[in-house]
Amino acid sequence: MNVMEESLQKHKEWKGKIEVCSRAKVNNAKDLTLAYTPGVAQPCLEIQKDPDLSYELTRRANLVAVITDGSAVLGLGNIGGLAGMPVMEGKCALFKEFADVDAFPLCIKSNDVDEIVNTIAMISDSFGGINLEDIAAPRCFEIEAKLKEKVDIPVFHDDQHGTAIVVGAALMNACKVANKKISDITLVINGAGAAGCAIGKLLLFLGIGNLIMVDREGIICEGDNYLNEAHAEMAKVTNKNKLHGSLADALKGADAFVGVSKPKLVTAEMVKSMNDKPILFAMANPTPEIMPDEAKAAGAFIVGTGRSDFPNQINNVIAFPGIFKGALAVRASDINEEMKMAAAKAIAGCVPEDKLNAEFILPNSFDRSVPVAVAEAVAKAARETGVARI
């Protein structure tokens, strides 16, 4: 039985990966009058007078909505919201297991931006935060931006920002090991979708020396007439030397590569053309842009992938549980760039200096100290930037 067959069998046994459990014991008539009618009327009236009391009198303060339209589920494409439910349930289970954050899956049967935004906005008062998941680009950018204007709780598209945060953490530590300064390096991102653009923005915020983005048409350069709005925005702040050409052209002399694209796009010759001690994060799943052994044989100094069977797994699970735990703890109204940067630095800091090496640049996914450290850093950054409400 392979892993796919075993997973299907487990899902049949589980009949869902999450369930609702009562925090209120209802064992007798008195319990019933307190948890439900008539006693429940009093907290309702208190919330009516002061909506912020919803954080104290309900579970809202620890509840995240995990929402998809099913348009970009894993590598499966647009399979629809319902078919994406197993992924959303899995995400909710990870929130609970790693950060004790309650999460609820919501799969929306629509690909219309305004319909999705309005649906989420209308139910947002039930939650303390919104995690958007597996929504295709470029629609995901518009949905997130419009939602941020409509609701006063954090909205976080994990495929963008969770990935970017972990890549940022990995790059910080990789540069330490390779004795490179982030402000001096040239980094190439292959794949200018949701994750690629978010990674680029965070690395620019981090102070990267030169960032070059590549999509299926080649190197993105300001003035290219085929660029969509998101790409045009990135073109203004990347590719300092106005390079044109292919991925191979972009990688010549580059210090680092981040792949969020397709399998086997990077060759040994491309790696050999890079600067000394090249850093490669080949994150296409399940087959990376270049396999680690091939990259190492070609001279790669540090290699990371999205897979757990190779060193340096770049996995969002070390980011999103702690990020939301920290944001919820201070009732943040947003998860801003400073909070994302704080999360990345906290993750990087979870690898002890004396253990940091080319095959250990990120903490283990099961290191339970990571979400705690991330939550503390995120909450602190929220207070410092004025988005914390307690």
Predicted regions and their residues:
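ADP-ribose/adenylate-binding Rossmann-like module
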Residues: N131-D134, A256-F310
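A short, aliphatic-rich alpha-helical micro-motif
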Residues: S124, I182, A250-L251, V271-M274
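General beta-strand structural signal in soluble alpha/beta enzymes
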Residues: P105, N131-D134, V155-D158, I189, ...
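Glycine-rich phosphate/diphosphate-binding loop of Rossmann-like nucleotide-binding domains
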Residues: L74, G81-A99, V151, H157, ...
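Adenosine-phosphate binding glycine-rich loop
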Residues: D158-D159, A178, A282-I390
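Short, ordered loop/turn segments at secondary-structure junctions
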Residues: D69-S71, I79, I108-K109, D134-A137, ...
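N-terminal ligand-binding/catalytic initiation module
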Residues: M1-V155, A381, T385-R389
